[in-house]
């Protein structure tokens, strides 16, 4: 998103406190340890999964995280599937890296995954999902998530699961792809 709200006073006060304290220089490239530890603890508390602090990388935003993830996982010419409609940054970043984008469209009359359709895409290097979906808000069921995870594992396809909007599903408790295994 692109929020237009003002910076809260609490944040401004903390920045001023740190500047007065004389903290200068760069943070570690993967983020400060206390923050990475808190995120690891959050995954344990929220999803009951162990995520080592070493697997957590802090970025300046989601697009930076996607760029790093794509650079780490894919090479020029790889084929990566996205489920439409989709957050445009996925497509744009992948194309800028000369990665072939394979667009999977849902059945126009359904809001669920057509498993038979997906079986046609075994020759992929990667799959990117957004849950809940950005922009339409569609939420994958546990069955759908598990299917996608197992499909990718079976065919050795790298899976990137964008779960940034998990906190705004109101009455739904969503699972992370990590609930089905560590290969995501």
Where is each model-derived feature located?
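Generic structural signal for small/hydrophobic residues in well-ordered secondary structure
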Residues: 15, 39, 56, 80-81, ...
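PLP-dependent aminotransferase-like
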Residues: 13, 53, 71-129, 150, ...
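A short helix->loop->beta-strand "cap" motif at the edges of active sites that frequently abuts
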Residues: 78, 99, 154-158, 182-183
